[in-house]
């Protein structure tokens, strides 16, 4: 189909170039027009067939052998050479053979065939595009074919002077044409050819003139709902509809009053609706558009094209309330998520507490089995403080077994001590320890856990330096005390320095 259309366009362009190079004489055009006018008076001769006649002096090339389609109303159409054309059989417009032989136009007419090879009266093949002209109301259609807006040849009615008047779309047209045969650019080229012929003034004006419509303006697009017949690569035709936008504005603004007074009678305005503050979009629907209307829009059409102001405000309030509820739900969900996190933290804290309790119980078990030695029982018997009664709850060795390790440290056996205790009426844990196990008395002139007594040894000086460094004295004073400590030599001086240092620290 595409190759056939491309060939039609190519042949048409070659014909136009040939016409530009060697225009057809006006005499030949006049004879052809006269023959076409006779055909309009004799419809019975419309389908007569003739053999091809060779061109006498027109000079048209072979691709320019175009078929001139017949019209029942007398308006011809230029057709390109189709795929179903025959070299032997030609379609004419009722023109007798003698007229063709006598004429010098060299135009040859052919049959127009459909894809099945049958001659057709009108263009009914699948790739035809039939467009309604919509320009003249009194134009009639023949066999369901519409007038094309891009018609190639229109014949007007002759005026009183005998010249043709171009009246595009006024003649009834039944023959269609292929949209791929003649493009928009070809229309402009034909107009250029006619303009050159009119400037030459070499041709006398006859009863008929060739009229080609101007190229269509792409800016002037029709928005009316006009059916368009399109090709579907078959013998069927698909009908589309050009419709405007389905959505229109809501509320119409009030128009200002015109300052000029109307010249004619005024129109009644009793049915004009009142102005509204706001309105929803109106959904327009036509059965030809192929669209469907939702039940909501049908209910709106039944109840009115516009929403009520109060109903619209109520809907807005409901939307706002729903948005608020959604926001509150989001806040609640976020709080619940935080509670779930806290619950997990509480569970982990409980587990840690249980572990600590287990550790404490373990430590208590270990402490109950440890023996603790208490000093103070290894005193010299000659010491005046040896006879002082000590707390009876304190024992030399504390353990689960009260008599444990006593036999090893006491002078008397355990059995004798138990018998002696029974005779005295109470059990006594006191006993005389062996000399090797007795603690030596604490010397007052020696350093011990009770107190520090400085001497001339390096250990005493190190202890004093540590006391100075760990004190809260200023750094300058610390450095000064360090220098004094290095200068002290004797034990008495070192003891006095220690006492002075302790007084400074205790302040």
Curated annotation (Swiss-Prot):
Task: According to the UniProt record, list the residues that bear Phosphoserine.
Answer: 86, 151
Give start-end positions of Acidic residues composition bias: 144-160
Q: Where is this region: Interaction with the L polymerase?
A: 361-377, 396-410
Polar residues biased stretches: 286-301
Q: Where is the composition biased (Low complexity)?
A: 260-270
> Region (Disordered): which ranges?
42-91, 133-163, 201-227, 252-273, 285-307
Positions of region (Multimerization): 304-376
Any one biological process term the GO annotation gives: DNA-templated transcription
Q: Where are the annotated segments for Interaction with the nucleocapsid (N-RNA)?
A: 459-507
Q: Where is the signal peptide?
A: none
Annotated region (X domain (XD)), positions in chain: 457-507
Taxonomically, the superkingdom here is Viruses
Q: Assembly and partners? A: Homotetramer. Interacts (via multimerization domain and XD domain) with polymerase L; this interaction forms the polymerase L-P complex. Interacts (via N-terminus) with N0 (via Ncore); this interaction allows P to chaperon N0 to avoid N polymerization and non-specific RNA binding before encapsidation. Interacts (via C-terminus) with N-RNA template (via Ntail); this interaction maintains the P/L complex anchored to the nucleocapsid template during the sequential transcription. Interacts (via C-terminus) with protein C this interaction allows C to associate with the ribonucleocapsid.
Entry domain remark = The N-terminus consists of a long intrinsically disordered tail. The central part contains the coiled-coil multimerization domain (MD). Forms a four-stranded coiled coil structure. The C-terminus constitutes the alpha-helical domain (XD) that binds to the nucleocapsid (N-RNA complex).
The name on file for this protein is Phosphoprotein
Originating species: Measles virus (strain Yamagata-1) (MeV)
């Amino acid at each position: 189909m595409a190759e056939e259309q491309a060939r039609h366009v190519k042949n048409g362009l070659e014909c136009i170039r040939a016409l530009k190079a060697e225009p057809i004489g006006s005499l030949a055009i006049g004879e052809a027009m006269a023959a076409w006018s006779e055909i309009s008076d004799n419809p019975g001769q419309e389908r007569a067939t003739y053999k091809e006649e060779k061109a006498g002096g027109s000079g048209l090339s072979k691709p320019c052998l175009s078929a001139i389609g017949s019209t029942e109303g007398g308006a011809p159409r230029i057709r390109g050479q189709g795929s179903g054309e025959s070299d032997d059989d030609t379609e004419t417009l009722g023109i007798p053979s003698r007229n063709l032989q006598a004429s010098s136009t060299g135009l040859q007419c052919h049959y127009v065939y459909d894809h099945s090879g049958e001659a057709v009266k009108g263009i009914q093949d699948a790739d035809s595009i039939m467009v309604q002209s919509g320009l003249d109301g009194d134009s009639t259609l023949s066999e369901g074919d519409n007038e094309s807006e891009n018609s190639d040849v229109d014949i007007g009615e002759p005026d009183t002077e005998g010249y043709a008047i171009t009246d595009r779309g006024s003649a009834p047209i039944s023959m269609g044409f292929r949209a791929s045969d003649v493009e928009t650019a070809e229309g402009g080229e034909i107009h250029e050819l006619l303009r050159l012929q009119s400037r030459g003034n070499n041709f006398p004006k006859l009863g008929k003139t060739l009229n080609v419509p101007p190229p269509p303006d792409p800016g002037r697009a029709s928005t009316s709902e006009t059916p368009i017949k399109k090709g579907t690569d078959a013998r069927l035709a698909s009908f589309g509809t050009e419709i405007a936008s389905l959505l229109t504005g809501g509320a119409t603004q009030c128009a200002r009053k015109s300052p000029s007074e109307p010249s004619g009678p005024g129109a009644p305005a009793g049915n004009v609706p009142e102005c509204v503050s706001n309105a929803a979009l109106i959904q327009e629907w036509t059965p030809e558009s192929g669209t469907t209307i939702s039940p909501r829009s049908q209910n709106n059409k039944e109840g009115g094209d516009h929403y009520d102001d109060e109903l619209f405000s109520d809907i807005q309030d409901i939307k706002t309330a729903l948005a608020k509820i959604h926001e509150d739900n989001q806040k609640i969900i976020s709080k619940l998520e935080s509670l779930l996190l806290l619950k997990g933290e509480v569970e982990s804290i409980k587990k840690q507490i249980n572990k600590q309790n287990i550790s404490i119980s373990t430590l208590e078990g270990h402490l109950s089995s440890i023996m603790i030695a208490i000093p103070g029982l290894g005193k010299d018997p000659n010491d005046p403080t040896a006879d002082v009664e000590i707390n009876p709850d304190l024992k030399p060795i504390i353990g689960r077994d009260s008599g444990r390790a006593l036999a090893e440290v006491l002078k008397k056996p355990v059995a004798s001590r138990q018998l002696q205790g029974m005779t005295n009426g109470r059990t006594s844990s006191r006993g005389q320890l062996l000399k090797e196990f007795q603690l030596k008395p604490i010397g007052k002139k020696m350093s011990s856990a009770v107190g520090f007594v400085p001497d001339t040894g390096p250990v005493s000086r190190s202890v004093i330096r540590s006391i100075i460094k760990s004190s809260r004295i200023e750094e300058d004073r610390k450095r000064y005390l360090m220098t004094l400590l290095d200068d002290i030599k004797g034990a008495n001086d070192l003891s006095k320095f220690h006492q002075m240092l302790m007084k400074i620290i205790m302040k």
